[in-house]
Amino acid sequence: MTNLAFQSSSQIQGRLSAWLVTHKLPHRPLGFDYQGVETIEVRPEDWPSVAVALYVYGFNYLRCQCAYDVAPGGALASVYHLTKVEDVADQPEELCVKLFVSRNNPSVPSSFWIWKSADFQERECYDMFGIVYKNHPHLKRILMPESWLGWPLRKDYITPDFYELQDAY
């Protein structure tokens, strides 16, 4: 898929998408959410350059980073909610960026080096979905024990047999 083909979409292109096109940064507009926040898709290999450009644009706060399983056997998504925090802004500008990866080799460049708040959030997505964030300084399980097998929030995850102890105190 060429960059131009990636940029073309039937979705409405917002102001940030137009800015990214002006600077020849590959992405695909996905429209707006119910609150009017613009949503774009970026390929994982393009994420480092787009993330730096968005930071330079003014998105200095990573409000939330999460992941979800699109469909059983389908792609996984890593989602970044960015906010442009300014002293005099009563309604800060926001953007949602989605990166879709194959569940067979889920790998996304880490944004920790741009937004430090990505640290625990990327670790949680790794722990629950198995998305590897390349160049993350301490990517390891954060909620599950290191010995845990599999990725519990994937739709195709099979729960291991275990027995709950009743009144164990």
Swiss-Prot record:
Subcellular location: Plastid, Chloroplast thylakoid membrane
Top EC class of this enzyme: translocase
A GO MF term: NADH dehydrogenase (ubiquinone) activity
E.C. designation(s): 7.1.1.-
GO cellular component: chloroplast thylakoid membrane
InterPro entries documented for this protein: NADH_DH_suC (IPR010218), NADH_quin_OxRdtase_su_C/D-like (IPR037232), NADH_UbQ_OxRdtase_30kDa_su (IPR001268), NADH_UbQ_OxRdtase_CS (IPR020396)
GO biological process: photosynthesis, light reaction
Keywords: Chloroplast, Membrane, NAD, NADP, Plastid, Plastoquinone, Quinone, Thylakoid, Translocase, Transport
Membrane protein topology class: Peripheral membrane protein
Membrane-crossing residue ranges in chain numbering: none
Major localization class: plastid
Catalytic activity: a plastoquinone + NADH + (n+1) H(+)(in) = a plastoquinol + NAD(+) + n H(+)(out); a plastoquinone + NADPH + (n+1) H(+)(in) = a plastoquinol + NADP(+) + n H(+)(out)
Function summary: NDH shuttles electrons from NAD(P)H:plastoquinone, via FMN and iron-sulfur (Fe-S) centers, to quinones in the photosynthetic chain and possibly in a chloroplast respiratory chain. The immediate electron acceptor for the enzyme in this species is believed to be plastoquinone. Couples the redox reaction to proton translocation, and thus conserves the redox energy in a proton gradient.
Family: Belongs to the complex I 30 kDa subunit family.
Subunit composition and interactions: NDH is composed of at least 16 different subunits, 5 of which are encoded in the nucleus.
PANTHER family: NADH DEHYDROGENASE [UBIQUINONE] IRON-SULFUR PROTEIN 3, MITOCHONDRIAL, NADH DEHYDROGENASE UBIQUINONE IRON-SULFUR PROTEIN 3
Protein name, per record: NAD(P)H-quinone oxidoreductase subunit J, chloroplastic
Source organism of the structure: Zygnema circumcarinatum (Green alga)
